[in-house]
């Protein structure tokens, strides 16, 4: 059992490291020579990359951040397949019970990695794209439904942060509606709340009516008072 627990712990650690890979930071550093944490919202996510570099790099970072979430969950599935074939899973382990919980832990680790990257002094993005990748890997129907909510809101409002918040709220509702395992539902609640908390400054701007729409530049307090 000790070896099995070590394998599970290693998978969660790798999931965190995958989430920590600073795609947005590297893209902006390589293409513009600046630290993305010092411009716009200070986030390393795709939206801030979009404002800083444009649509192409923004879409590229969005895809890679989403892929990080997919890979984190795929790693868990691979572990169970490999360990089962090699008879590494203890007979006392109920796979149907363990796998959803380990998927959930790996998902949480990837989200924390993206927003608290060990490679960036525990700073990062808001974990929206990485969360989407996790949801798609957990259950593609949940992922698509959540993305659908995001897409509808962004099409109407043209505000990415509002769309992300509404998607975060929708996750747990969709999980319950589609009768997902309890660990997934708990992930939807905890992950959704975490994403919303990461948008605190956006919520303040939304309430003040100063949150930029797609294509608009974020005006900082310094620029407003200049």
Swiss-Prot record:
<feature type="transmembrane region" description="Helical">
    <location>
        <begin position="1"/>
        <end position="21"/>
    </location>
</feature>
<dbReference type="Pfam" id="PF02660">
    <property type="entry name" value="G3P_acyltransf"/>
</dbReference>
<keyword id="KW-0997">Cell inner membrane</keyword>
<feature type="transmembrane region" description="Helical">
    <location>
        <begin position="134"/>
        <end position="154"/>
    </location>
</feature>
<keyword id="KW-0808">Transferase</keyword>
<keyword id="KW-1003">Cell membrane</keyword>
<dbReference type="GO" id="GO:0005886">
    <property type="term" value="C:plasma membrane"/>
</dbReference>
<dbReference type="GO" id="GO:0008654">
    <property type="term" value="P:phospholipid biosynthetic process"/>
</dbReference>
<keyword id="KW-0812">Transmembrane</keyword>
<feature type="transmembrane region" description="Helical">
    <location>
        <begin position="60"/>
        <end position="80"/>
    </location>
</feature>
<keyword id="KW-0443">Lipid metabolism</keyword>
<keyword id="KW-0472">Membrane</keyword>
<comment type="function">
    <text>Catalyzes the transfer of an acyl group from acyl-phosphate (acyl-PO(4)) to glycerol-3-phosphate (G3P) to form lysophosphatidic acid (LPA). This enzyme utilizes acyl-phosphate as fatty acyl donor, but not acyl-CoA or acyl-ACP.</text>
</comment>
<keyword id="KW-1208">Phospholipid metabolism</keyword>
<keyword id="KW-1133">Transmembrane helix</keyword>
<comment type="subunit">
    <text>Probably interacts with PlsX.</text>
</comment>
<keyword id="KW-0444">Lipid biosynthesis</keyword>
<comment type="pathway">
    <text>Lipid metabolism; phospholipid metabolism.</text>
</comment>
<comment type="similarity">
    <text>Belongs to the PlsY family.</text>
</comment>
<dbReference type="InterPro" id="IPR003811">
    <property type="entry name" value="G3P_acylTferase_PlsY"/>
</dbReference>
<feature type="transmembrane region" description="Helical">
    <location>
        <begin position="159"/>
        <end position="178"/>
    </location>
</feature>
<keyword id="KW-0594">Phospholipid biosynthesis</keyword>
<protein>
    <recommendedName>
        <fullName>Glycerol-3-phosphate acyltransferase</fullName>
        <ecNumber>2.3.1.275</ecNumber>
    </recommendedName>
</protein>
<feature type="transmembrane region" description="Helical">
    <location>
        <begin position="182"/>
        <end position="197"/>
    </location>
</feature>
<feature type="transmembrane region" description="Helical">
    <location>
        <begin position="102"/>
        <end position="122"/>
    </location>
</feature>
<dbReference type="GO" id="GO:0043772">
    <property type="term" value="F:acyl-phosphate glycerol-3-phosphate acyltransferase activity"/>
</dbReference>
């Amino acid at each position: 059992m000790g070896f099995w627990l070590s394998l599970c712990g290693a998978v969660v650690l790798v999931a965190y490291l995958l989430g920590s890979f600073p795609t947005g930071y590297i893209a902006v550093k390589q293409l513009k020579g600046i630290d993305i944490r010092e411009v716009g919202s200070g986030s390393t996510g795709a939206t801030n990359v979009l404002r800083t570099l444009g649509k192409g790099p923004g879409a590229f970072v969005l895809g890679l951040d989403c892929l990080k979430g997919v890979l984190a969950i795929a790693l868990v599935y691979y572990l169970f397949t490999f360990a089962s074939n090699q008879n590494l899973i203890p007979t006392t382990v109920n796979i149907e019970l363990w796998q959803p919980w380990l998927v959930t832990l790996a998902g949480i680790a990837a989200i924390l990695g993206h927003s608290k990257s060990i490679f960036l002094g525990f700073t990062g993005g808001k974990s929206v794209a990485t969360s989407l990748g996790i949801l798609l890997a957990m259950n593609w129907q949940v992922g698509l439904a959540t993305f659908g909510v995001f897409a509808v809101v962004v099409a109407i409002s043209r505000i990415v942060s509002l769309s992300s918040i509404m998607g975060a709220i929708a996750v747990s509702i969709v999980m319950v509606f589609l009768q997902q395992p309890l660990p997934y539902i708990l992930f939807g609640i905890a992950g959704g709340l975490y994403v919303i908390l990461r948008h605190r400054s956006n919520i303040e701007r939304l309430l003040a009516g100063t949150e930029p729409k797609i294509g608009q530049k974020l005006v900082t307090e310094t620029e407003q008072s200049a």
